[in-house]
């Protein structure tokens, strides 16, 4: 069966840099920092006091007040991003409802809701928790609510693969279209886990930065790095079969050409030595897209700001790209947004598509002290206009989940 070409026709995002695509991308290009003091709970007694929060988000711009009370924050963020992406695409979702699917990831779903309802149960009895507790909390509900809101009756799933989930969602959607199952997919990721239990759990495993200065907390590839900064938000893309998009005169941002996914099968949190799983994953994505390593100009790296991730990912890039690795603009936008966990891959796919459109690599901010183990071109502190034909986006998750996407500049 002939494989169909897949393009991006709609983008939407809500993240620590902005509540829509335009504001977020302007901030990313300018190297703004979206990290600040935690405001969603009193973190004064916590070692970690910083996060990448979404600012001034009004759920009633998405749903009415009554409906908002039935949804967890990660679902509301996903709905906002999806609404922007679908509007941006110009799709007639009612006319094509049965042909449009949804794949949207969340790593931990409604964790803050679980905490809130457990407290309520302890105080009033467990049978007094909200009747909406379970549907609010489960990770698939953001995907489901997008499908319900827009009447989308194609395949609807939720990859729960930790920090690789958003990229798995986009990649799985790409393959669904390429292989002829649906002509259109709404895909990406969403997360909102900035809560006492979320921050406490990641702090306990020594994964989070405990820096007090927002400009010295999320430090991907820098020798000073000491952990990631929790972020929240959602990134959603509309993917579409090329001829379907052309037939309706859709605007095209970029083309998705390759996807790789695999597992380290090594450890539940630590990456495989030398980035072995990431090496294979990037090779799978390049082979899937029939793209040579030398063709890649830009990588939106996983780049969390943990010691092991950044050194292993750098080693993996060296192994895959050889002498060409030093010519690639390798960027961690997590330096600006923090780590959105299951939402990261969606937001970073949005940024990668825009980088290709605008021929501009956003910076890795806060970069001051080079690490001998991290010796690539990280576009330090100031973004760069550059010619780019192909770009790659990496996501590496707890459990050894690896996912990689390859995008191509749209020449139409």
Describe the residue ranges of each PLM region.
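ACP-dependent fatty acid/polyketide chain-elongation machinery
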Residues: 1-67, 243-253, 350-365, 408-412
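Flexible, low-complexity linker/loop segments at domain and module junctions
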Residues: 1-8, 96-97, 289-295, 323-326, ...
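Condensing-enzyme catalytic core mediating Claisen C-C bond formation in acyl metabolism
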Residues: 5-9, 33-36, 213-289, 297-298, ...
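Short glycine/threonine-rich loop-to-helix capping motif typified by GTGT followed
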Residues: 266-275, 304-321, 340-347
């Amino acid at each position: 069966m002939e494989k169909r070409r897949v393009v991006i026709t709609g983008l939407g995002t809500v993240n620590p840099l902005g509540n829509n695509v335009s504001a977020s991308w302007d901030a990313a290009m300018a190297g703004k920092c979206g990290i600040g003091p935690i405001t969603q709970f009193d973190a004064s007694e916590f070692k970690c006091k910083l996060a990448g929060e979404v600012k001034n988000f009004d759920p009633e711009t998405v749903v009415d007040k009554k409906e908002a009370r039935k949804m967890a924050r990660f679902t509301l963020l996903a709905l906002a991003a999806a609404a922007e992406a679908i509007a941006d695409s110009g799709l007639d979702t009612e006319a094509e409802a049965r042909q449009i699917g949804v794949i949207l990831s969340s790593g931990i779903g409604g964790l803050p809701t679980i905490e809130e309802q457990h407290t309520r149960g302890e105080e009033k009895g467990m049978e007094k928790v909200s009747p909406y507790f379970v549907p609010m909390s489960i990770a698939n509900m953001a995907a489901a609510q997008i499908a319900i809101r827009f009447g989308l009756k194609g395949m609807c799933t939720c990859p729960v693969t930790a920090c690789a989930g958003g990229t798995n969602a986009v990649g799985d959607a790409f393959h669904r279209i390429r292989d002829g199952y649906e002509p259109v997919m709404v895909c990406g990721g969403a997360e909102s886990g900035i809560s006492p239990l979320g921050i406490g759990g990641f702090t306990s495993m020594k994964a989070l930065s405990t820096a007090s200065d927002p400009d010295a907390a999320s430090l991907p590839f820098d020798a000073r790095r000491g952990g990631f900064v929790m972020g929240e938000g959602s990134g959603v893309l509309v993917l579409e079969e090329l001829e379907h998009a052309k037939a309706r005169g859709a605007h095209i941002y970029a083309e998705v050409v390759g996807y790789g996914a695999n597992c380290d099968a090594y450890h539940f949190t630590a990456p495989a030595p030398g980035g072995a799983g990431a090496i294979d994953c990037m090779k799978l994505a390049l082979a899937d897209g029939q793209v040579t390593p030398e063709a890649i100009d830009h990588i939106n790296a996983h780049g969390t700001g943990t010691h092991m991730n950044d050194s292993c990912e750098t080693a993996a890039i060296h192994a895959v790209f050889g002498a060409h690795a030093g010519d690639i603009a390798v960027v961690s936008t997590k330096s600006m947004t923090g780590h959105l966990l299951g939402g990261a891959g969606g937001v970073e796919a949005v940024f990668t598509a825009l980088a290709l459109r605008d021929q501009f690599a956003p910076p890795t901010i806060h970069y001051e002290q080079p690490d001998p183990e991290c010796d690539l071109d990280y576009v330090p502190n100031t973004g760069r206009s550059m010619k780019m034909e192909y770009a790659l986006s990496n996501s590496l998750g707890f459990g050894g989940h690896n996912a990689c996407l390859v995008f191509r500049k749209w020449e139409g």
